[in-house]
Curated annotation (Swiss-Prot):
Its EC number is 3.6.1.26. It comes from the Bacteria. InterPro entries: CDP-diacylglyc_Pase, CDP-diacylglyc_Pase_proteobac, HIT-like_sf. The keyword Nucleotide-binding does not apply. Keywords: Cell inner membrane, Cell membrane, Hydrolase, Lipid biosynthesis, Lipid metabolism, Membrane, Phospholipid biosynthesis, Phospholipid metabolism, Transmembrane, Transmembrane helix. The keyword DNA-binding does not apply. The chain crosses the membrane at residues 6-26. Pathway: Phospholipid metabolism; CDP-diacylglycerol degradation; phosphatidate from CDP-diacylglycerol: step 1/1. One of its GO terms (molecular function) is CDP-diacylglycerol diphosphatase activity. This is CDP-diacylglycerol pyrophosphatase. It holds the Pfam family CDH. GO terms for cellular component: plasma membrane. It comes from Klebsiella pneumoniae (strain 342). It is found in: Cell inner membrane.
Length: 254
């Protein structure tokens, strides 16, 4: 009987994996589209003509670009100027690699510029999806609005967030999340990818399973959010799920 149960469980996992893979290929289009835009258009245009187009900004010294995503009025992507696939890349655990989350947070002003009015920090979120939760194979951090319901939940559970990675009560969007508080000074000094790899057991060996997000807390500190792929709970580890690219939170703040 036990052998049958194991077989059925293995079969279920295989089916879920196939479904997840099918979803990925169905929605991915060309998974190298962003990489081609960055490496074949934005970077050469900046180098040769001092024009970042079609990117909004190319920072050659910092090793990143900012690119307006086609989804939503204010969503931007921060991407490296060289090849990095995603959260699974060993380069992200190299201390010499740029601190992309810090750069993305520093670049959030571009949302206000496009909006034509200040976008409050508590309405902004950063997110990078896991290997199974993304559709593009070039590293990209989504800079976009936070979902209003996620904002409310983070405010409600603020007391449960500490300087250690701990489960966020109730998770987010039906998925389990770990949360860790950081200050801007800490974020400037140390990459969240290193914090995750060095502080969460077994994370270093399986970084590609994780998605990371960040938002501001009500006290002005920042909260890092991490979720791990779990096919049994249909969690593809897409931290972008905490974002609202339509930016309804800006209407709620009026």
């Amino acid at each position: 009987m036990r052998r049958v149960r194991y077989f059925l469980l293995a079969l279920l996992v295989a089916i879920l994996a196939a479904l997840a893979g099918g979803y990925y290929w169905l929605h991915s289009g060309n998974p190298d589209a962003l990489r081609k835009i960055v490496l074949q258009q934005c970077v050469p245009h900046q180098q040769q003509q001092q024009n970042p187009s079609p990117c909004a900004e190319v920072n050659l010294k910092g090793g990143y670009v900012l690119f307006k995503d086609r989804n939503g009025p204010l969503q931007y992507l921060l991407m490296p100027t060289y090849r990095i696939n995603g959260t699974e890349s060993p380069l992200l655990l190299d201390p010499l690699t740029p601190n992309f989350f810090w750069q993305a947070w520093q670049g959030r002003e571009i949302m206000s510029q496009r909006h034509g009015a200040p976008v409050p920090d508590n309405a902004i979120s950063l997110a990078i999806n896991s290997r199974s939760g993304r559709t593009q194979n070039h590293f990209h951090i989504h800079i976009s609005c936070l979902r209003p319901d996620v904002r409310a939940q983070l405010d409600k559970d603020a007391a449960a967030v500490s300087s250690r990675w701990l489960p966020l009560p109730g998770g987010l969007q039906g998925h389990e999340y770990l949360a860790r508080r950081v200050t801007e000074a800490e974020l400037a000094q140390r990459s969240p990818f290193l914090m995750l790899a060095e502080e969460v057991p077994e994370a270093r060996e399986h970084m590609g399973r994780f998605a990371l997000a960040m938002a501001q807390q009500s006290d002005g500190s920042l909260v890092l959010l991490a979720t791990e792929r779990n096919l049994l709970t249909l969690n593809r580890a897409s931290a972008e799920e905490i974002q609202d690219h339509r930016c309804a939170i800006l209407n709620a703040n009026h």
